Amino acid sequence: METKFVKLSKDINKSEPLLKECIELFDSVEAYDYPRFRSNINDIWGTVDFDPFNGKTIVMDNIKDWEKFYSNAIHQASNSGLSVWLNIDRYNGENSKDNTLAWSEVRGTQHMIEKSGNPLHIWTFACTIVWYFDKTMNRWIERRYHASLQGDFGIPISFKFRSKIPVIWSVLKNKLLGK
């Protein structure tokens, strides 16, 4: 189930719902294969929020901004001779009772080291991601995405975690489940 770009903590239960789908999404992004990534989503307005400097929250709320951020930040680092991978440290997935909606929460750490194997502390960060999935054409497709980045960008930075997950979940329940 692991790939070149995605590693699982030994504590992860590999039979958790949607783990395979989450790994596919991560793997396609880590490989910069955005067409493959887009084939597994029905979400052009995913949100990433993080607070790396001076309390200012940056929000990316569309796929193009997100791809630009990822390409600029991670792709440039891997092109400069660093080995890049994501470790999934914690995972939880659940399906709705009628099996039409599911969500997963992933806590991961991005790692970068020199390709020679020297541990080079350039960019590690923790990221909590919540994906909401629904069934489309008999397979799970990512429907809504939210990530909050926290952690260490190679220099001591204080992050303020401002998650919008409860708000997103409330909207989803109203729109998708009619509650």
Predicted features, each with a name:
Residues 1-2, 103, 123-166, 171:
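Short beta-strand edge/turn micro-motifs at domain boundaries
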Residues 1-53, 178:
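Short, low-complexity N-terminal intrinsically disordered segments enriched in polar/charged residues
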Residues 22, 85-93, 113-114, 126:
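Short structured motifs
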Residues 34-101, 105:
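A solvent-exposed, acidic/Ser-Thr-rich amphipathic alpha-helical stretch
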Residues 81, 118-122:
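Short consensus segments that form the blades of beta-propeller domains
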Residues 105-113:
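Generic short beta-strand segments
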Residues 112-117, 152-154:
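A short, acidic/glycine-rich surface segment
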Residues 170-179:
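Low-complexity, charge- and small-residue-enriched intrinsically disordered regions
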